[in-house]
Amino acid sequence: EKAVGNHPFCVILPDDFIHAQHNHNVSRLVEAFQETGCSQLCVMSVNGPDISKYGVVEPGKRSNQVYRLVEKPSLEMAPSKIASIGRYVFTNSIFESIKSIGVGHGGELQLADAIDRLARNGKVEMVLLEGSRFDCGTERGYLNAILNLADRRKRVRENTLEKDIPILEASKYDKVLDMVDENFFTEKTF
């Protein structure tokens, strides 16, 4: 709070890796903030039970308005398929919101709860993600990011993946990812 003072600021969560042809998602958030003065969330559509891994937006009446943000709801309780991901622009009002919330999901202070409080005052909007998002906060997600990005780079694909891991070409990673379980990344593996 002392570092940013009264200035708006960006928050980028490091376990959300975003790959886009033009890396401008944060710029789009900043531009939207400059137009409206509202805090901004980067969002994406999530189908099925994976929605319970995210803060989920209940859209407001205005275009791009966030009415509510619900932290990790069940599929049945999710207000939409719009998930907040780790890119934000906030005004300094987020700090008062954080101070006013109690312990939330998982017994921790949740940024989503603070955002929800701001949203209920009509001060939060959303910008749709452009590109692909990878959850590098899990071993499986991290491996998925590595394999997908390597496959996009012709030189890496030709010199490594197609020679050393030929199963990838036929399966598009599913077989490799299915071989990965919670024990794959233990010290015994290496």
Predicted regions and their residues:
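Conserved alpha/beta core of the MobA/IspD/sugar-nucleotide pyrophosphorylase nucleotidyltransferase superfamily
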Residues: 6-8, 59-65, 72, 79-185, ...
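Conserved beta-loop-beta/alpha segment of the NTase-like Rossmann-fold superfamily
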Residues: 1-59, 90-92, 97-101
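A short, flexible beta-alpha/helix-coil linker loop
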Residues: 16, 75-76
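Short glycine/serine/proline-enriched coil/turn segments at secondary-structure junctions
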Residues: 48-50, 76-79
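Short, well-ordered turn and helix-capping elements at secondary-structure junctions
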Residues: 44, 70-73
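A short linear-motif detector with a strong N-terminal bias
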Residues: 19-22, 34-38, 66-69, 105-106, ...
